[in-house]
A protein has these predicted regions:
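Cell-envelope/glycan interface and biosynthesis
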Residues: 1-151
Length: 151
């Protein structure tokens, strides 16, 4: 298995955890197809000298709610917070359909090669956020300005 590592929630470019371990619910509860695509991409990235870190994967509803509440405090309103953090009802992390990766060289590598695995950057303001949004080798959807644009 490639040197993919799990890190803490939402900390692009800051490694907090150990090796990728599907017994960790942040990884083990990812959609199996997303996880498989991520592992394949990480193997190929490693061949190119890029180590991929998972900074956030599956999140519980309560954790997502805490992140959203913190964003409301930080940005001053729910509308502004939604540009950066989804609610538990709309978060792709809660369903296991999104993963945040780092460090920056891994983000850059996935930006160039992710569609080969079906992995697509979804938001312009979150270069670390990827979802399985196309078939391997397909065309990724247009990148949205931010998470609030999706709703």
């Amino acid at each position: 298995m490639p040197q993919v590592r799990v890190a803490g929630n939402h900390a692009p470019d800051h490694e907090l955890g150990g090796p990728l371990d599907t017994s960790d619910p942040t990884v083990g509860r990812l959609d199996p197809d997303l996880l498989g695509a991520l592992q394949a991409a990480a193997r190929d990235a490693q061949t190119d000298g890029v180590r991929m870190v998972v900074t956030s994967g599956w999140r519980s509803r309560s954790h997502q709610q805490r992140l959203f509440a913190e964003a409301v405090r930080t940005y001053g309103s729910e509308a502004e917070a939604r540009r950066y953090v989804s609610t538990p009802d709309t978060s792709e992390h809660v369903t296991g359909d999104a993963v945040d990766v780092g460090p920056t060289d891994a983000d850059s590598w996935l930006s160039r090669h992710g569609a080969r695995y079906g992995l697509c950057q979804m938001y312009a303001n979150e270069v670390w956020h990827y979802e399985l949004a196309t078939t391997p080798g397909g065309r990724c959807p247009e990148v949205l300005p931010d998470a609030s644009s999706r709703r």
